[in-house]
From Swiss-Prot:
<feature type="binding site">
    <location>
        <position position="305"/>
    </location>
    <ligand>
        <name>[4Fe-4S] cluster</name>
    </ligand>
</feature>
<dbReference type="GO" id="GO:0005506">
    <property type="term" value="F:iron ion binding"/>
</dbReference>
<feature type="binding site">
    <location>
        <position position="312"/>
    </location>
    <ligand>
        <name>[4Fe-4S] cluster</name>
    </ligand>
</feature>
<keyword id="KW-0411">Iron-sulfur</keyword>
<feature type="binding site">
    <location>
        <position position="270"/>
    </location>
    <ligand>
        <name>[4Fe-4S] cluster</name>
    </ligand>
</feature>
<dbReference type="InterPro" id="IPR045854">
    <property type="entry name" value="NO2/SO3_Rdtase_4Fe4S_sf"/>
</dbReference>
<protein>
    <recommendedName>
        <fullName>4-hydroxy-3-methylbut-2-en-1-yl diphosphate synthase (flavodoxin)</fullName>
        <ecNumber>1.17.7.3</ecNumber>
    </recommendedName>
</protein>
<dbReference type="InterPro" id="IPR016425">
    <property type="entry name" value="IspG_bac"/>
</dbReference>
<keyword id="KW-0560">Oxidoreductase</keyword>
<keyword id="KW-0408">Iron</keyword>
<dbReference type="GO" id="GO:0019288">
    <property type="term" value="P:isopentenyl diphosphate biosynthetic process, methylerythritol 4-phosphate pathway"/>
</dbReference>
<keyword id="KW-0479">Metal-binding</keyword>
<keyword id="KW-0004">4Fe-4S</keyword>
<dbReference type="GO" id="GO:0141197">
    <property type="term" value="F:4-hydroxy-3-methylbut-2-enyl-diphosphate synthase activity (flavodoxin)"/>
</dbReference>
<dbReference type="GO" id="GO:0046429">
    <property type="term" value="F:4-hydroxy-3-methylbut-2-en-1-yl diphosphate synthase activity (ferredoxin)"/>
</dbReference>
<comment type="function">
    <text>Converts 2C-methyl-D-erythritol 2,4-cyclodiphosphate (ME-2,4cPP) into 1-hydroxy-2-methyl-2-(E)-butenyl 4-diphosphate.</text>
</comment>
<dbReference type="InterPro" id="IPR004588">
    <property type="entry name" value="IspG_bac-typ"/>
</dbReference>
Length: 372
């Protein structure tokens, strides 16, 4: 198998968003946000359930009005994944969704109202054991910080975040996480680095407004990858102008690439050349779609010829190495069989599903033995 990442994660305190642990070594949680009208309960519930199916640990929902808060109550009753309510300006909305079982409040203490209103929200969160996310964004910095720094800078984002952190500290509230997002990769990365040195609360990572499905995924992979490789980050969202389901897929792909957290199949495939003995690209594309339901962590290498194929297969759960008319199939580094190149997709799908079932059963037995 491929080596696990030698990443030493930053030490942080732990909070819980619903039943999902955040920080203190817990698995890095992958989040997304709905883009439906929250008042359209059916559409929002359907989107949240779609996110659940692809592995979302947490889902954020914008709650801009009291009507949306009433809709949130109905939404919460119909889904299982923990929900974060995204709230700005009106403290009463925060109090209302707290009544309806929200799992986390995303607010900026600076725009939620005066000191008394902030205290009311924090006291309510404390009483109901609801964590808060302080969300600082380069696009909405306080006016005095814009004037002081002239433009968003890492120091400006840090100062904004620390204002809000200090505010919660004065109210003796410790159950919170912090984000300092920007659309510029280097601005976001340096802001998180500075913040990580200042506080020990969990950090929520993101490159905000990253872009469309392709460009946004690239920017997020670079920015989040840099931070995660340094051990910074306890939860993340990949922000894309695309179907939110894609955010979850890209988020897990980033974690899989860094060997931090695996969910489903990690496909290793060659870019192809004239040496390929079967349709590698078509095979990989078809299998990625067919096997989206597999959540068992496993490496599958699909290489079109014998130049690199055997080497990759040696360190893969399953590996295929292209050959004339038939290709070699490896399991756990050992050559087991040959597959007909003309029926590669169906054969390989069946082998992968069988291997996933075998691994799941082995893990189930291991858990039972530990429990005994």
């Amino acid at each position: 198998m491929h080596n696990q990442a030698p990443i030493q994660r930053r030490k942080s305190t732990r909070i819980y968003v619903g039943n999902v642990p955040i920080g203190d070594g817990a698995p890095i949680a992958v989040q997304s946000m709905t883009n439906t009208r929250t008042t359209d309960v059916e559409a929002t519930v359907n989107q949240i359930k779609a996110l659940e199916r692809v592995g979302a640990d947490i889902v954020r929902v914008s709650v801009p009005t009291m009507d949306a808060a009433e809709a949130f109550k109905l939404i919460k009753q119909q889904v299982n994944v923990p929900l974060v309510a995204d709230i700005h300006f009106d403290y009463r909305i925060a109090l209302k969704v707290a009544e309806y079982g929200v799992d986390c409040l995303r607010i900026n203490p600076g725009n939620i109202g005066n000191e008394e209103r902030i205290r009311m929200v924090v006291d309510c969160a404390r009483d109901k054991n609801i964590p808060i996310r302080i969300g600082v964004n380069a696009g909405s910095l306080e006016k005095d910080l814009q004037e002081k720094y002239g433009e968003p800078t890492p120091q400006a984002l840090l100062e904004s975040a620390m204002r809000h952190v200090d505010h919660l500290d004065r109210l003796n509230f410790e159950q919170f996480k912090v984000s300092v997002k920007a659309s510029d990769v280097f601005l976001a990365v340096e802001s998180y680095r500075l913040l990580a040195k200042q506080i020990d609360q969990p950090l929520h990572l993101g490159i905000t407004e990253a872009g469309g499905a392709r460009s946004g995924a690239v920017k997020s992979a670079i920015g989040l990858g840099l931070l995660l490789s340094e051990g910074i980050g306890d939860t993340l969202r990949v922000s894309l102008a695309a179907d939110p389901v894609e955010e979850i897929k890209v988020g897990f792909d980033i974690l899989k690439s860094l060997r931090i957290r695996s969910r489903g199949i990690n496909f290793i495939a060659c870019p192809t050349c004239s040496r390929q003995e079967f349709d590698v690209i078509g095979t990989v594309n078809a299998l990625e779609q067919r096997l989206e339901d597999i959540i068992t962590p496993m490496d599958v290498s699909i290489i079109g010829c014998v130049v690199n194929g055997p080497g990759e297969a040696l360190v893969s759960t399953l590996g295929v190495t292209g050959g004339n008319k038939k290709s070699g199939l490896y399991e756990d580094g050992v050559r087991k069989d040959r597959l007909d190149n003309n029926d590669m997709i169906d054969q390989l799908e069946a082998r992968i599903r069988a291997k996933a079932s075998q691994l799941d059963e082995a893990r189930r037995i291991d858990v039972q033995q530990v429990e005994k």
